[in-house]
Amino acid sequence: MSKVLSTLRYSAEHEWVDAASPTKVGISQIAADALGDVVYVDMPEVGAELTAGEPCGEVESTKSVSEIFSPVTGKVVEVNQEPVDNPAVLNEDPYGTGWLFTVEVSEEGPLLSAEEYASSNGGDVE
């Protein structure tokens, strides 16, 4: 089973949120495993205004293209270049070096605890 980190919160669309300030966002290992080999990542630019639940980028794999939905409302303050340069990092380390961007949050969207997310999606909480 895919790993779900207990220290993070999750959106129903498979993004994770680390609530430190600024808030770090990524995709879950469950999402990365379902996508297969990731070959391309498109993310919002620094300064972009995001709305919780709205698309803000996409991840392309050898199997499909999936949108990235912002789990929070706010302004992008940093984009991680690593997944752009090496998209496979989303498969290898989605909770570490594979984080996507950080946001100065003005409002959170509906988020699930690790236990709720794992229960709904078949992951193991660690």
Place the predicted regions along the sequence by residue.
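Acidic, low-complexity mobile loops and tails
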Residues: 1-55, 88, 92-126
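Short, Lys/Arg- and Gly-enriched loop/turn segments at beta-strand edges
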Residues: 60-69, 86-89
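Charged, alpha-helix-enriched surfaces in structured cytosolic catalytic cores
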Residues: 71, 85, 112
